[in-house]
Amino acid sequence: MFERNCRRQVLQKTNEGEWENIMNEKLQIIFGLLGGLAVFIYGMNMMSECLQKAAGEKMKSILALLTKNPVLGVIAGALTTAVLQSSSATTVMAIGFVSAGLMSLPQAISIIFGANIGTTMTAQIIAFKISDYIYIIIFIGFIISFIAKSEKVKSIGQTIFAFGLLFLGIETMGDVMKPLASSPVFTNLIERVAHIPVLGVFVGTLMTLVVQSSSATIAVLQNFASQPGPDGVTSMLGLAGAIPILLGDNIGTTITALLASIGQTKDAKRTAVAHCIFNISGCLLFIWFVKPFAALIQHISPKGPEVEVISRQIANAHTLFNITMTLIWVCLIKFMVKIVMTLIPDGKAVDMDSAKPVFLDDKIINQPAAALQLVAKEILRVSEMVKVVVADTITIVKTEDMNELEPLQEKGLQ
């Protein structure tokens, strides 16, 4: 009896110890993944901010010049986003220019189409295998930013430093994901996601809504898909399983943009809606051709063991998806404008004789070029009002008709 109780206690302690080890391992994976994701997002945001400091004004000039037709607008949007590594920054610039009257809504929408292509550059960069050089890159970036006297050179150093952090985050996420390959529960879950495209779209959308960055969730997807299955060669997820999640990531980022446009100008809302239509229509189109699309990507991408090339394949799928949808929608840009104008109409006409500011918009105060243009338009509007008031005053003085004074006073109080 005593021996049986001893065995039971030993077994119970063993089970408790195993359960504690399992929980510790799971917590390490969760916090490692979250920590790696945090480093990645911080590095990406820092790199974007530094690039905007170094080249932001030049990119604004390019945007203003290359928007005479939709094709040039697409090129300008893609180039600006690729350089700044931020589709949000490009979108904000475009909205600011529309509000200031520097470009039309179709031109702004074409820039958004280009921004969708430019943002795929992040995924292409992530697909490079530079894990052996991460700490060298971080060190070089730190030294340049630490010893530089010029603000521009310091921004370049910080950009290099942030670039290294971005890959450090990716490397951290990859390291903590490796134990998941041996988990039967997790592999069964992944098999379900891989075989049900709609579920993959839902997972991708939810991930982007939570993280608030499609570049970050696509980086997680690339990293996760690069984890080997039981045979050590094939991907846990596979390209056909990754594409629906990729489509969901694209939908998630449009919902984020829609939420961000609440309380903004009508043009900001129209731009967000156009972005939403672009990605949702793409998802609805591509979801029916996941396997043929995956086969095409595998054909045009580098060959090799799946776990080594799938990150590049996902990046290529992301790029080809956005290029295809841009080619479709740039031909239908007038139709897109009609849709967004119908969904968000102009409403009542602007009262140009109002005593309150008409063109000033504090939402674009951080864009000096666009804000100054709005100030100039407001000054011209008020100048016209002053000219009318002065002319009416001179008429009243000459005619001595005091009955004309009351309408003039009312005009000044509007």
Please place each PLM-identified region on the residue numbering:
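Short, Lys/Arg-enriched N-terminal segments with co-localized hydrophobic residues
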Residues: 4, 8-22
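Helix-loop-helix hairpins and the membrane-proximal interhelical loops
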Residues: 24-70, 160-206, 224, 234-235
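Hydrophobic core segments of alpha-helical transmembrane domains in multi-pass membrane transport
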Residues: 32-45, 77-81, 138-148, 162-173, ...
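C-terminal ends of transmembrane helices
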Residues: 44-53, 94-99, 141-154, 257-263
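Alpha-helical transmembrane segments of multi-pass membrane proteins, especially transporters
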Residues: 57, 61, 65, 69, ...
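Membrane-interfacial helix-loop connectors
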Residues: 81-84, 92-118, 124-133, 144-145, ...
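Transmembrane alpha-helical segments and their short flanking loops
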Residues: 170, 177, 181-193, 230-236, ...
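Non-transmembrane accessory domains of multi-pass membrane transporters/channels
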Residues: 323, 330-414
